[in-house]
Amino acid sequence: MVIHSATKYLGGHSDILAGTVCGSHELISSIKKSGLNFGSNISEYVAWLLERSIKTLSVRVLKQNDNALKVALFLSGHKLINKVYYPGLEKHEKHNIAKDQMNGGFGGMVSFKLNDNINSDDFVKSLKVIQPTMSLAGVESTITSPIQTSHKKMDPTERDKIGITKNLLRLSVGIEDADDLIKDLSNSLEING
């Protein structure tokens, strides 16, 4: 069985909430009652928005992949960045696997750690093009702090053990001009460095 969010890249415009469940008839039958009890259909409007978005999926994803690689390369060469997590970088520990499996596109998500002397909240507030948000994978570039969002309720000691620290940021790269994104990041690093 495969459960996939249609809210992120498939939707791509931060304007729907949807998902898909795919699998054999046997597996789907085992959860069908839950779907009927809890509601498993999206509205006609959301279906229309999703259909609209899927038509541009390949164009959006290609641009996001291209931009993300450019941004990751910039960040990986900056003195105020401790680490960049992006499988498109040759120095990423899983680069060869990603290269084999991902057909040259490494995704639009770039995580990175700021130097310890930079306050991540101030860094995010200084950004002008990239916006802080809870939503990821839209056409616009957004940034989140996992300790304030996805991992907020996790024990801080456990978070630190797995590398989710106060200086870790998660950047969802959109389809803006890559130079504008790099300039935005560079300006914020300069202001806060």
List each model region and its residues.
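Positively charged, small/polar-rich N-terminal and surface patches that mediate targeting and assembly
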Residues: 22, 83, 131, 137-139, ...
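PLP-dependent enzyme catalytic core of the Aspartate aminotransferase-like
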Residues: 118, 125, 141-193
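Conserved small-domain helix->loop->beta segment predominantly found in fold-type I
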Residues: 69-128, 132-134, 155-160, 193
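Conserved PLP-enzyme active-site core in the AAT-like
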Residues: 1-80, 85
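Structural motif
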Residues: 1, 7, 20, 48, ...
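Glycine-rich beta-alpha junction loops
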Residues: 8, 56, 71, 88-92, ...
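Short, flexible turn/loop "capping" segments at secondary-structure junctions
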Residues: 12, 42-44, 102-104, 161-166
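Short, well-ordered beta-strand elements within core beta-sheets of diverse protein domains
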Residues: 49-59, 107-115, 170-174
